[in-house]
Amino acid sequence: ASRGLGDVYKRQDLYFNFRHTVEIVNGLDIGLGFSAHKRTAVEPSRFVITGDYPMPPPEFMDKFKNTYISFAPRIRIESTPGLYYYMNGKRKINLHSIYPTFSVDYERGIKGVFKSTGEYERIEFDLQHQIRMGLMRNIYYRFGFGAFTNQDELYFVDFANFSRHNLPVGWNDEIGGVFQVLDSRWYNSSRRYVRGHFTYEAPFLILRHLMKYTRYVQNERIYISALSMPHLQPYLEVGYGIGTHIFDVGVFVSSENWKFGGIGCKFTFELFNR
C-alpha cells in the first residue's frame, strides 16, 4: 500500500497553550499548565493498493486519521541556586547567580480527554549558565536533552526547549544558545536529542589590531554548538560574531555527520536593550 494525498506533515495545527508559574522560594519556580492541539490534514488521506497486496487490517488503518487531537497536562520546574535579586517596590528583579539554572519540563498526553486520540510523554532537561570573568569577558554555556516516550498511535514531535526560538535567559545577545544554520526539519524529525552550546565573549579577540575601523564594536564572540540525534551524529556549528550598541551579527559554518552542511548569518537589533 502507498500513502496517497494525506501527508502527515501537511496539517493545519489549531492549538492552545496555558501555563501559570509560581515562585515557591527564591530561585525555585514551578509552572503548571496544559497544551491542546487539533491537527487536521490539508487534504484528506487515502490509501491506494498497488499490486496484488491485500487490504491492511482495520486495526492498522485506524492508526491513520485525517484529524489528530491531543490534550496534555504539563509541569515545569526551574531552579537557580544562590540567585541574587533586589526589590523595586513590590517587584522582584532577578540578577545573577554563580550557579547554573536547571529546568525539567514534563508533559503527558492523555487519550480520551476532549476527544484526544493518542498518548505520549515528553520530558526535557535544560541547563544554562553565565560565568563572568571580568573586563567584559564572559563564558556562556547551555546543555540539554529530551525525548518522547510511551507513545500510543501516531504522535507529533513538538519539543519545548529544542526550538529555534527558545533563547537562553540573561545572555548578552540573541544569537548564542540556539542553532542558527540547522535545517528546520530536524527540529521535528526525531523523538530524542542531546545538544550543547558554548559562547566566549571578550572585547578584543580578532579585531584588536583594527581599532581604527572597529571602534564601535563592543565585543566579539566565538560560538560552538553540537547536536546528536538519530541520523544526525553529530551536527556541529561554529560561528564568529560581533556586538555593538545597536546590533549583533554572527556568521556560522555547519557540519552534518562530519560533512559540510552550510553557511549562514544571523543579524539582530539591540536598539532597545542597551
Predicted regions and their residues:
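Single conserved hydrophobic/aromatic residue that forms the stacking wall/gate
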Residues: 1-5, 9
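Outer-membrane beta-barrel translocator domains and adjoining extracellular loop/strand segments
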Residues: 2, 42-49, 87-92, 114-121, ...
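C-terminal outer-membrane beta-barrel translocator/porin domains of Gram-negative envelope proteins
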Residues: 6-7, 103-204
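Residues that define the transmembrane beta-barrel architecture of outer-membrane proteins
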Residues: 12-16, 67-73, 117-123, 190-198, ...
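Residues on the lipid-exposed face of transmembrane beta-strands in outer-membrane beta-barrel proteins
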Residues: 16-24, 34, 73-81, 125-129, ...
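Structural signature of outer-membrane beta-barrel domains
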Residues: 25-27, 35-41, 80-84, 109-111, ...
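Short loop/turn motifs that connect adjacent beta-strands in outer-membrane beta-barrel proteins
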Residues: 27-30, 83-99, 113-117, 133-140, ...
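Predominantly the C-terminal beta-signal and adjacent terminal strand-loop region
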Residues: 52, 104, 243-274
